[in-house]
Amino acid sequence: MTVTISFEPYVGSSVDALSIPLYLRCQLVFKLSKPLAAVPLLESGVNRLVQALPFLSGEFTAVPASDGGKEILLVRPVLNFELSRILKIKYHETSLRHVCKQMNRPSSQGGDLPHEPYMPYPRLPDPSRPQPIVGFQVNVHTDGIILSVATHHCSFDATGMGSIVQNLAACCRSPPSDEPDLTTSPAQEAEARKVLSQVRETPFDPKMFPEYRPLDSMLSYYKGVQSALQGRQTTIVNRCFTIAADKINALKRRCNQLIPEMVKKYGLSTEDAIGSAWVSSNDVVAALLWTCINRARYPEIRERSVHQLPPDLLHATSSLGVPVNVRSRLSPPLPKSTLGNAVCLLREKVPLQFFALPSHANMEATSSVCADHSGDDEWALSFCRVAYGLRAKLNAIDDDYIRDYISYVQKSPCHLSVTLDTENLYLSNWREIGVYDADFGGMLGKPLRMRAPDGYTDGLIFVMAQRSEDKSAPWEFNISLEASTMKRIVHDPLWCKYVELDAFWHGEE
C-alpha cells in the first residue's frame, strides 16, 4: 500500500544524539477469539497514525558534516513510502503459549535469538543503510495476536515508545469518520526538540559528565555495540519475574521509618536528609535488585559479614545506571506525551561492602547461609542507605542540572553516548509508559501482557509498565544475567522472599 506522506527533514535534539543506536523493542500480547478479524483494524490504525504524525514514516541516518565536525543525525522522509516498510503481518499456526515457550530458549552458536522472527527489525540496524524510526509486526496466532513494536533509540526513549503505542491504540479505536484523539502533534514534537537543544553560555568542561563517552564516529560505535552484543548472547540468560506489590510497599514503609536512624548512624548530612527524607517504590525495587545481583555475582557477600570479606571485595565498588525521564523535571515541564528522547543517566556508585551481611551474623551456623537477613535491623539500615542514595541522586536532577547536561552534549567536539560497559548494572524503568492503559477498542481491548525481549546484556533490567487500574498488580520485570549468576540468584533466600518467576512467560500451561 503506497501512502502519500510529507514532512520536512529534521535534526534530532541534543538528547537524541546521546542514545545507543539500536531499536527499543517490546511485545504486546492480546488474547482473542477471532485474531484474524483484528488484522485490518491494526493495519488501518498504523496507516492513520503515520497520516496524523507523518514523521513516524521517516528514516534515521547520519550525514557527514561539511566542516568535518560531528555527523548530523537526521530524520528524513522516504520517497514513495509504502506502509509495508514499517508494518509487517505474519501468520503463525501456533498458540500464544507455544511461542512463549519457544522464546525461552537461548540462541546457539551465535545465531538469531528465538524472538527475532516475531520482530519488525533486528535489534541492531545496518549502520550503512537508512533506518526506519518506527516499526510494527502483527503476529497472528490461533488464539491471539502478539504486536511487536520497534522504535529507534536515536529518536525515541521508552516513554516515547509508550506514547506511540497509546496513539496507535487511539487510531485503532477511533471510528473512521472521527479524528483520533492523539496525545501529541508534529508542532509539539518540534518545540520539544528545540527545548532539548537550548545551550547555556558556559565553557565546555570535558570532565563534567564522565558517564558519557566520546565516540570516534557513529559507524564505529554501531560496529562496537554489534560485536559486543552478538558475542555475549549465547552466554546470557534472559528471564521474566514479578514482585508482589504488597511486598514492595512493606519494604518501602520500613525504609522510610528507618531513614532518621539511618541518617544518624552513617553520619549523612542533615541538609541532604531534608531534601530527600523518603524513598519511593522505584528506589526500593532498584536497591533490592541491585542487592540480589551482587549477592549472586559475589557469593562471599551473601555468606560473610563485612569484616570477613577478602580485601579485593572489601575495597571494591558497584555501580548502577538508571535512565531518568526528565520531562517533568524541566521548568517549564515538557508534556508527558513528548515522543523524543528526554532522559539523562543517573549513575550511583557505592562500596560493594554495603551489600554484605550484618557484622554480627554468625557464620558458624548453617542457618546464616540459608537466611535472607532482611528482618535484621542492621541489614535493613544498610539496604535503606542504598535506596536513599538513589533518591538523593534523583532529587539532584533538576532544571539546572538538565540545562548543564544539554549544553555539555551540544558543546562536545564529538558525539557522546552511554556504553553498556560503564556500569555493573543498568535498570531501565518503564513503569510510567502507559502501555497497559492503551485501549485499542472493542475488538482488541488493552494488552494482556508485555515484555522487553532484548536483554542479553549482563546486568540489564527492564521494569515493565504498571497497571494503573489495579494498584495491587505485581511488578513485572525482565532481567539478563550470566547463566551461572542466574542459577545462583534464583536460589538466594533474599530473592526467593520477594521475587517469583513470571508464570505467563515461563509456565508450562
Curated annotation (Swiss-Prot):
Pathway: Alkaloid biosynthesis. GO terms for biological process: alkaloid metabolic process. Keywords: Acyltransferase, Alkaloid metabolism, Transferase. One of its GO terms (molecular function) is acyltransferase activity. InterPro entries: CAT-like_dom_sf, Sec_Metabolite_Acyltrans. The keyword Acyltransferase applies. It comes from the Eukaryota. Its EC number is 2.3.1.-. It catalyses: (2R,3S,11R)-aszonalenin + acetyl-CoA = (2R,3S,11R)-acetylaszonalenin + CoA. O-acetyltransferase; part of the gene cluster that mediates the biosynthesis of the prenylated pyrroloindoline diketopiperazine acetylaszonalenin. The first step in the pathway is the formation of (R)-benzodiazepinedione by condensation of tryptophan and anthranilic acid catalyzed by the non-ribosomal peptide synthetase anaPS. The prenyltransferase anaPT then converts (R)-benzodiazepinedione to aszonalenin in the presence of dimethylallyl diphosphate (DMAPP) via C3-prenylation. Monomer. Belongs to the fumigaclavine B O-acetyltransferase family. PANTHER family: FAMILY REGULATORY PROTEIN, PUTATIVE (AFU_ORTHOLOGUE AFUA_3G14730)-RELATED (PTHR31896), TRICHOTHECENE 3-O-ACETYLTRANSFERASE (PTHR31896:SF64). This is O-acetyltransferase anaAT. It comes from Neosartorya fischeri (strain ATCC 1020 / DSM 3700 / CBS 544.65 / FGSC A1164 / JCM 1740 / NRRL 181 / WB 181).
